[in-house]
Amino acid sequence: MAPPAARARYIANKADNQILSKKPPKRPGLNGNNKTKEATPAGKKKDKDAKKRNQPTSGGQEKGLPNPIMPSVQTAFKTFVSARLCSAIWAYIADCDETFNYWEPLHYIINGHGLQTWEYSPQFGLRSYTYLLLQGVPGYFYQKLFNPSPILIFYMVRCMLGFGCAVMERYMYKSICQEFGIHIGRLWLIFQLFSVGMFVSSTALLPSSFSMYFGCAALAAWWQQNYCFAIFLTAISALLGWPFAALIGIPLVLEMLLRQRDWKTFVQWTLISGATVAIPMIAIDTSYFGKLTFAPLNIVWYNVFTSHGPNIFGTEPLSYYIINGFLNFNIIWLLALQLPIMLVIDYLIVPAKSKSTLNFPHYISLAPLYLWLLVFFAQPHKEERFLFPIYPLISLCGAITVDVYQRIFFRMKSVVFKIKAGVHYLDHSMFIAILVMVTSTLLGLSRVFALYRNYHAPMDLMLELNQFKATPQYDPDVIYNVCIGKDWHRYPGSFFFPAKNFRLRFLKSEFRGMLPAYYDEGQNATKVVQPYFNDLNQENEHMYFDYDRCDFLVDFDEGKYTALEPNYSKRSKDWSVMKSLPFLIPEKSHKVLRAFYVPFLTDNHIQYGDFNLLKRKTKRNGR
């Protein structure tokens, strides 16, 4: 429970965060009911407020001004579910790590075959099967009960992930409205709904997305001073999801130990939470790997304490995250980065009453975002998914920055034009919030449309392969080899194959790194140590397949060819084109217009190649 002084400041702040007319209307509570009493600013008596509400004023509600838009928690939840289901259906798989490290092992758990990466080899044990079972168990029963097409299992899992994300966002929305005010909560809601980053990450089968769900839910619990629940959610995020997500919980730990001095609760719930999550996790992973395995410890050891670590997979400059942040959050990203400076300016020129929050000052409650950026910006190896856990915080900090700009604008205007006391800052500055919301929404929709248009071809192309199952040529007793060369990283996964008798095969290309291989047949396949796996990203000839044994071939024709990467579609004696879809050629396209779709302009400044699905003409083995 917040102290009386903080509670009084919060009540004043909540009143500040309404779009006040001269005659404020009764409004529903956060849960959509009308039982919540109107907030009374600190230092004001109810009878005086009632008299003011009964006095007619020019421009008030009696002239037909609309009620303020304050979505209830249930309304917000419905919009979140709608947005995340759209992501489940239309988002493409942006990261090959998601395909090979998660969708493929999940396919193995559900259907008994799939590709294995070196991270799942028992001698390394960097990935946890426990995390996969959260999706694998529902998918397994769905498959056994209804025997659906594999692609339906894929989209069922995605819808589950999207719904889980929406539940987190609902909880966080309520907490933000309580801690930071309804105006900021409303801005955050809009930014989340139209964020490209959330569109991509919310339904991604990645531990970093899982950590986003539970890490941000932990922050929401913390802002409500539900410390025990916050610790438990942080443990789930870090142990069952991504261990580096524990970084989000550091400000929570410091606040408990240094400000609250509640060592007993912290130690007690850390032990309870750790044991509750870690013990079953170790038991499950040990049974899969055939040896004692604690995957979170292994991945931390590999990334931090080995001599090579993740840098062998590529390094990027600091600008990578700056550009990536703008692509995923556009102007909201820029606003979030400048929040610390804007809070200082706000502190210097805006009266203190306008800066209140319920429980924590901004430098504590928002510290997880900037701590995360400080740590991950400094790492040479950068991936888009590394920022997933803080995506909702980017929207929140962007919303707070907009609110600060509104306060500063009103303060400056009130000094210059001598605005009378009692006028609310939102009456004169709401155009700033509307301008930011409209701009960010248009940029977000433009980016989402560009992503779907430019990069969705591999998923659509694999769906075409499902049509082959309905032809007389299909034989359920034959293994069909679907080959892929240089475009292996664009493969969306075995769930897109029409049946269990299709296999992905790799053709040798200019790529010289480690590729996955199929799990062995049999019940103990996850326990087998394969000699061809290594943790140095070195290629192994075992992964390559004989070109002459391919039944289908997936290839992107971008106009560049080598001896190992020929134009397969031109080999008309061997192949016929089943389907060809446009796929962006980045090097031949305008940088801005390929990133954001602009009607009447984009088509004239970008270039597509043909993403082809080829079927072998000549029969083999009598087929």
Curated annotation (Swiss-Prot):
InterPro entries: GPI_mannosylTrfase. One of its GO terms (molecular function) is dol-P-Man:Man(8)GlcNAc(2)-PP-Dol alpha-1,2-mannosyltransferase activity. Disruption phenotype: Imaginal disc cell proliferation is slowed resulting in smaller imaginal discs with aberrant architecture compared to wild type larvae of the same age. RNAi-mediated knockdown in gut progenitor cells results in increased intestinal stem cell mitotic proliferation. It catalyses: an alpha-D-Man-(1->2)-alpha-D-Man-(1->2)-alpha-D-Man-(1->3)-[alpha-D-Man-(1->3)-alpha-D-Man-(1->6)]-beta-D-Man-(1->4)-beta-D-GlcNAc-(1->4)-alpha-D-GlcNAc-diphospho-di-trans,poly-cis-dolichol + a di-trans,poly-cis-dolichyl beta-D-mannosyl phosphate = an alpha-D-Man-(1->2)-alpha-D-Man-(1->2)-alpha-D-Man-(1->3)-[alpha-D-Man-(1->2)-alpha-D-Man-(1->3)-alpha-D-Man-(1->6)]-beta-D-Man-(1->4)-beta-D-GlcNAc-(1->4)-alpha-D-GlcNAc-diphospho-di-trans,poly-cis-dolichol + a di-trans,poly-cis-dolichyl phosphate + H(+); an alpha-D-Man-(1->2)-alpha-D-Man-(1->2)-alpha-D-Man-(1->3)-[alpha-D-Man-(1->2)-alpha-D-Man-(1->3)-[alpha-D-Man-(1->6)]-alpha-D-Man-(1->6)]-beta-D-Man-(1->4)-beta-D-GlcNAc-(1->4)-alpha-D-GlcNAc-diphospho-di-trans,poly-cis-dolichol + a di-trans,poly-cis-dolichyl beta-D-mannosyl phosphate = an alpha-D-Man-(1->2)-alpha-D-Man-(1->2)-alpha-D-Man-(1->3)-[alpha-D-Man-(1->2)-alpha-D-Man-(1->3)-[alpha-D-Man-(1->2)-alpha-D-Man-(1->6)]-alpha-D-Man-(1->6)]-beta-D-Man-(1->4)-beta-D-GlcNAc-(1->4)-alpha-D-GlcNAc-diphospho-di-trans,poly-cis-dolichol + a di-trans,poly-cis-dolichyl phosphate + H(+). Pathway: Protein modification; protein glycosylation. One of its GO terms (cellular component) is endomembrane system. It is found in: Endoplasmic reticulum membrane. The chain crosses the membrane at residues 152-172, 193-223, 229-254, 266-284, 326-348, 360-378, 390-410, 431-452. One of its GO terms (biological process) is protein N-linked glycosylation. Induction: Down-regulated by bacterial infection in the gut. Its EC number is 2.4.1.259, 2.4.1.261. It is a multi-pass membrane protein. It comes from the Eukaryota. Keywords: Endoplasmic reticulum, Glycosyltransferase, Membrane, Transferase, Transmembrane, Transmembrane helix. It holds the Pfam family Glyco_transf_22. The keyword Transmembrane applies. Probable alpha-1,2-mannosyltransferase involved in the N-glycosylation pathway. Probably involved in glycosylation of the TNF receptor grnd, regulating its ligand affinity. Required for normal epithelial growth and architecture. Suppressor of JNK-dependent intestinal stem cell proliferation. Belongs to the glycosyltransferase 22 family. This is Alpha-1,2-mannosyltransferase Alg9. It comes from Drosophila melanogaster (Fruit fly).
